[in-house]
Every structure is written in C-alpha cells, then in structure tokens.
Amino acid sequence: MKRKVVRLSTLFALFSFVGTFSAQEKKKDSIKENSIGEVVIVAFGKQKKEEITGSIQELKPKDISALQNGNVLQGLAGRVAGVQIVGSGQPGSSPSIRMRGIGSINASSEPLIVLDGIPYPGSLNSIPSSDIESLSFLEDASSNALYGSRGANGVIIITTKKGTRKGIHVDFDIKTGINFRATPEYDIITSPAEYYLAYFNRVRVGEKASGKTDAQAYTEAINKMNATLGYNAYNVPFNQLINPDGSFNQNAKLLYQDNWQKLLFRPNLRQEANLSFTANTDKLKAYTSLGYLNDRSYLIGSGFKRLSLRSNLEYALNEKLKFGVNLNYSNSEQNLGDGGSFANSFQFSRNIAPFYPVYLRDNDYNRVYDIKGRAVYDYGDGKGPNGARRSYAVFENPVGNRQYDLNKVTNNTVNTNLFVQYKFLKDFDFTYNFGGVIINSQELVYGNPLGGTTATVGGRLAKSNTLKYAFNHQQLLSYNKQLGSHNISVLLGHELNQEKSDYFGARKEKLFLEGLTVFDNVLKMNEIPGNQYDYAVEGFFSRVLYNYKNKYFFNASLRRDGSSVFSKESRWGTFYGLGAAWDISKEDFLKDSETVNALKVKASYGQQGNDIFYFPGTTDRIYYAYKNLYKVSNFGDDTPVVTTEYLGNNKLRWENSQNLNAGFETALFNRRLSINAEYFERKVSDMIYRAALPFSNVGYYPRLENIGNMRNRGVQVSISGDVVKTSDFTWNLYANLTHYKNKITKLPDAQRENGIADGLFLLKEGSDRYAYYLKEFAGVNPLNGDALWYKDGVDAKGKAVKQVTNSYAEATLYQTGKSAIPKVYGGFGTQIRFKNITLSANFAYQLGGWGYDQNYRSLLHSDNYASNYHRDVHNTWTPENPTASLPRIDISNSNQNASSTLFLVKSDYLSLQDLTLSVGIPQKFLENYGIRDANIYVTGNNLFLLSKRRGYDPRLSISGVSETYGYNLLSSVSLGLNLKF
C-alpha cells in the first residue's frame, strides 16, 4: 500500500503547527489517525501527542540544524508560539526569554530549563545543538504543574540524543564561515569637517538665541571650539577652520583620520565540527559525541571557544530492569565584550567625535611607537599633539583596551544524569533519577599599565573562582492500566534539588611586568571578595492521566514545594494543574469527513510558583530573602565596619501564577493544512517589588514585599501547510502570531492612586508593566527653537487643560498611552525541496510596540563636550531653518534634548533569522566510500533587519529601551559538509 508522509514543522505562536502527521491517501479511515506512537517530551516522562491537554510545542533537529549559536536558544526568535527571545551578539551568551508575557516585575521571568529530565542550573553554551534531540516548550499550567515552584514562567525541556537508530552509525558535520556585525551603526557624523561645522553651528545658534550678534556668535563659537575640542585634525588653526559665512575652509588639509569602528569591528572566522557515534541493539542504546567550536566575534578580542564530550548510554538488563547514564563534559572560554562604561566599544565608537585619533601622534602628527615597535594609543590625556586633551572619555581607548586588556571567563562543566527503572507487578514501575552538575568558573580581568584608566594605578589584575554544585534526586512511582476503553496513568514522586556555590576572588594593582597575569607580578593588594550560598527546594507531587476511548482526555497534577529562599512560616506552597481535551474528529458525526482529518479542543488551568528574586536594580539572585544581609569592611586599621546590604522580610511569600489555557488543534485537507489556536491568561498574585522605606534606611537595597497583582491575556495561533507535495518537489509554508495585553491589577493602597514611578515607566493599576511615563514633547518654538512640552493647567473658565511650556521643570509627566509591549509578534518561513536541493528561510517580526531610543537622544546632545552627533543634527532648528521638527541643540541649555516622548520610536521590525541552501550528493558518488548520506550546505543567520531607524535594533531589549552598552547582534555565513556513515 502506497503511503505519503506529510511533515509539518513544529512552530510557534498564534498559528502554531505542532508536529509530524502521517496520512494515507487512499484509505479514508487512516487519515483520521495521528502517527502511531508519536510522543512528546513532558514533565517527568513522555506522552502521546493526541493525549496532550495543554500547550506544548516541540522542535526537532531539523528545526535547529541551521542555527550557528554557542547557545541553542539564542537563534530561536520567531520559532516558537508565544515565546519572545531577546539576544546579544556576544558569542556564547544566554538570551532573555519570555513565555506568554511578563511573569514578574522584580522576580525572574525566565523559564525553567530542564536537561534530560533534570533542572539544569548551568549555561546552555556548554551543549552543542548537534547533541539535541528535541526542545519542548511547556507554556500552560497542566504542562508545568509538576515543576511547582519553578514552573511559573514556563519550562523548556531539552532532550539529548540517544542511540535510537538500529545498528551502528557515524555522523560528521563541519562548517567554516564568517561572523560580522548584523546591524549598521546609527547615521552618525564620520567626517571631521562635518563635525567641526556641526559643533560650530550648535554654539553659534545658542549664542544668537541669547541675543548675540552674528559676529559675536561667530567669535564665541570659534573660541569654544578651541577651548573644548582640544584636537585640530587640520593644518590651519581653529580660528581659520570655518569662514565668517559659516562655510568650511576649503584650503584646510586633513592631517589624519582614524576610523574607530573599522578598527574595533572586523569580520572574523567561525569554525565548528561535530562527530557522533550511535549504536542500537536489543539491549543497548548508545550515543557518543565530540564537538569543537571556535566562534570569533566581529568585535576584536571577543569570542567563544568550546570543546565538548558527551556519552549517553542506556542498557536493558532484562524486561524488568533498565538503567542508563548521561555524561557530558564541556570546557569553554569566553572572551567578553566591554561592560557598561565609557570604555564600552559600542557606546564609545558611536559617541566619540570623528576627529579624535585612535593612535598617539607627535607634534608633527606622526604616529608614536613604543620601544617594542608597537603603535601607542591615544587616551586623550594630554599626551597628544601640542598637549591636546579630549573633553570626552579621557583615559579611555577601547581599541587599545581590547589589544592589551583581558576579560576572560573559563568554564569547566561536568554534568551527570543517572537513572534506574524497575517494572513490577505488571502495571507498576519505579524510577530513580539522579542529576549532578559541577561548574568551575574562572574569571580573569587584566587592565594594562600602558594606557587608560588602569594605567593610572600601574595596571590591575583581578581573578576569581566560582565552584558551583547542583544535585537533584527524583523518586518516581508510576501505575499504568488499560481497562477496556478506559486508560489510566498515575504518577507519584518526590524531588530534592540542592545547590551550593562558593565564590572567591582577589584584585591587585601596580604590575611589575606588563602582560604577566600572575599575582606575584602585581605589587599592591586591593581587595579579596568572597561569598557563598546554599539553596534547596523539595517537592512531593502526583499526576493522574485518564482517557476514554482515546477521545476524552483528562489530567490532574498536584505538587507541594518547600524552598529555602523563604522563612519557615512561608516556606511551603501548593501548586496544581488541571486539563481536559476532546478529540472531536473521532466522533461518529465527523470521523468520515474528507475535509477535517483531526480536530481537538482543549482547556487547562492551574497555579505555579516563583522563588527566584533579585536584589532591586540588579540581576543578582537573593537566596535568603527573609534574612538581613551584612557586609564587613576593613578600612586599613583592622577595625571592622559592618554595613547592611539588604533588609530581609520573614513574611515574604511565593509569587503565584494562575494560568488558564483554551484552544483547538486541527488538520485539514488530507493533513495538508494544520492550525493550532489558543487563548491564554496568566494572573500573577503576591507580586514581588521593592518597598518604600524611611529616609534613614537609604544606603542599601530596599526590602522586598508582596505588593500586587498582574495579568497577561492573549491569543496565539499558528498555521502550517504543504502547498505542493510530490516525490520530487515539496513546498511548505508556516506562520505564527502572538498577541497579548499586560495589566497591573492591584497595588498597595499607598500607591494605588499615583502608582510607582519606575524609570521611564509607571506601575499603576490599569496600566501595563512597560507603559511609558514621560514628559510630552509639544514641538518647537519657530521663533527661537526652544523645545516645548505640555503641562497641566486651567483655562479662563477654570477647566483643566494642557498648556505649552518651554520650561522642562514645569512640564508634567504623563502616561503616554504607548507601551514597549508589541501588539503582535511571531515568525514565518518556508522550506522548498526539489529532488536533492533544499532551500529554507525563517523570519521573525513584531508590530505595534514603542521603543525609547536613548542612543538617538545621546547623539542629539546639548552638552559642552565633544561627543558625536546623529546627522539629524542638521535638521534641528536654526534661524535659517525655523520650521524644523527638532529643537535647537546648543551647549547653553542641556534640557533641549531632555527625556520626553520625542525619543519614542516604533519598535516594529522584520528580520531574516536564517537562510539555508542544502544540496544532497547523489548516492552513486558515495557508495564506494561507505558513506550512507552526504550534503553540502550554505547557511546564514541574522542576515537582514528592517526597523524604524538605522542603528536601532528592537531585538536587543524587552523593555524597549535602546541598549547603550549592548552588544549588537552577530551575523554568520558558513559553508558546511555533513556526512553519515
């Protein structure tokens, strides 16, 4: 009997096709059946897809094979329904992930990561994507309930490969490519002449606005250029650079020009190779792999290297007893980008004026070299030509820093999972799982003594070592029974998860020899920090699965958790999940339909908890939320000084998340079209936030309290279908869309009316978490170029009205009605195969949100120092351009570009996430070499971005605020070869 297999990709939100179906063209009854034995990874086991009552989406190796990321989650934007992924260009970095909205304000909103059934506390950059068999995204309560206190923000279950193919197989994959910067820089000034003119005009316009004549304004502008800018890149004096008519002196000759961005950002090499062996016999399943990755970034001196080894073994001693072990070792080295300071390469190269040199020059403008023949870098500290000194970022030079400094993290990770399973009394089995993770993390930070801020102390060396242990014990007793048309499965379990971390570091200053990174080479002790923590969570849980005639499905889960984060009075919490589904397509009235091949409706509800809280304003976790934390300092006289770092709260309790999910799944037209639509509602109660404290308590982190409630409500739909499907040609399309609204539903009585100001946002009942709270820009005064804003006032009749003011201090802060939360987000893509040639493309998008472009604002500054401008500075108000939409920018009034709605920008975007062309090598060329299958491919990631403003990348921030110190995303293009033996 001839069969056709229709494969529909598992993909994402609002229109989410999930899975692979089998269809038989000729036999009508077979069309109604899902693929026999098709299972999905769920909490503490597997389930047939048809039995799922909640929201679970699964990605397989074919869905992630095109990714070129040290962390597999980094490249999945737009690939999973309801999931937002915000990444970084730093190779090996972990992205921020949000499932179905915002899970918390001050607690974690990140999902739980489970690796081979065990919660994983490490970074996923230790695991090559080639080792992954599946990624399951659990988004609703019935799916997450068994993870209790850790499942509130969703769960991602990662399952590594086993020896599932019969016989012995060898797979080898190698690819080499280029990494380069994904997004262009803002449209900044790059010409020294253009900058000098822009600065001159900013001063001139400001002086004229203050009442000076043209001649006086010209003279004052020239004098301030000479006094402020410091460096003159031309062969004529400052007072001759610009003519009295405001034009640039055409006789001025440029003496030098260094391009900061070209020296910092260069295409670099990427190399990856993975070798795996699989074996499968009646008793043994084995998978062993060796992986190598060298992911050099386009930012000089930055990158990620990894060497990994994995061995997964499973052995059935007899029909009753089975055991297995998963072993993974990873050694990684991550050379980091710059932190949040003037030395940050992205911030610095964007804002440094283009006439400032990278390299030090003498009075004749020749480069200066040291005794080793190396070019000396210019740090703007008065050593430049004729004693020139910068007015911006003195003692900083990121090109020099990245040449001589080090910021390296080396991780050694050992991960061991063991299990023993014993079946008894026909319908029972008992499983013991053990997971152990040991992570040794060593950080080395070296600041050179040659130049920059560390040179002022003779160089600096800091080293630290963090040793982290995590152990997980699970005991699972299950019962499975079929009684006629009734099927029941019961699970009882206990889990104990323990973590311990010990951190120790030291920092010294004043190096004896340059470049030698051992403490014996450094003379002066600076500090020796250290800390440790212990964390434990214990849970008792149960689950009941029931179905009748494989048409009506029900499940119930219950878990009782205790966490060491809380005091004894608040330590334990109870969490649950309920789910039901009805496979309508198996009913008599629909089973003979030639159009509807599958139709299932489902609903679930439940409650999970959250015990991951942060010190306010940081991403440092609080492990003892109920205790006061202290710091002991010594100021050199052996007298201890004890300061309070954090005020504990022994009444602090769990954040609770109540999740409702309802939807349907259907397959139509001989399973050529698949649709999944779901409605969801997440309510967060007892939300954690920092408390308002008396002024006397200022000086340490404020206390955390359970202050309010929040809600996320939305829909997600995915659709996937085969446009064409023949033996030689297939064409598949998919699309997904997610929409949700966030709303704060309860705050303490003291903050209920006015809300809580939180930076650019206002936390207020009825508003969403990222609702902007800003002064409203009212335009430009055409007479003098003053920026205008609105303020609350009253008219002649005493009626409240908005009035216009040029005083920023008088302007009123308003709820703008604009939010950083997009109206919709998702992805779409296609795969086309013609014989042995396959082309696939995946896109991501978001629409309807707003960003706050802090970078753009800083490039239209009014400060009296020489940082760069956006070219829109030419479109600001001047006497010659009185109708400009941007206000006068001068150095006499810093409020002209003060924070307001002027700097809100639409955060819509469309990005090409990956594009792959693969060509299979015909078998006739392989058979004499023992090669079973081979293909050559070209793949690219992050190849294209459309956004509202050049340089602004909405993909870098969940809050919508442009990342001043962010690491721009990385593009990769590689050529690869895959061989199967």
Residue map of PLM features:
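Extracellular/periplasmic, surface-exposed regions of secreted and cell-surface proteins
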Residues: 32, 38, 64, 90, ...
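Gram-negative outer-membrane beta-barrel transporters
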Residues: 705-822, 833, 844-849, 853-855
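Extracytoplasmic gating/loop element in the C-terminal half of outer-membrane beta-barrel translocons
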Residues: 247-250, 453, 563, 846-935, ...
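A short beta-strand motif that forms part of the nucleic acid-binding face
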Residues: 151, 162, 176, 291-292, ...
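A surface-exposed, glycine/aromatic-enriched loop/edge motif typical of exported proteins
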Residues: 185, 189-242, 330-386, 503-505, ...
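Short, small/polar-rich motifs associated with maturation and membrane association
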Residues: 1-310, 315-318, 322-330, 339-345, ...
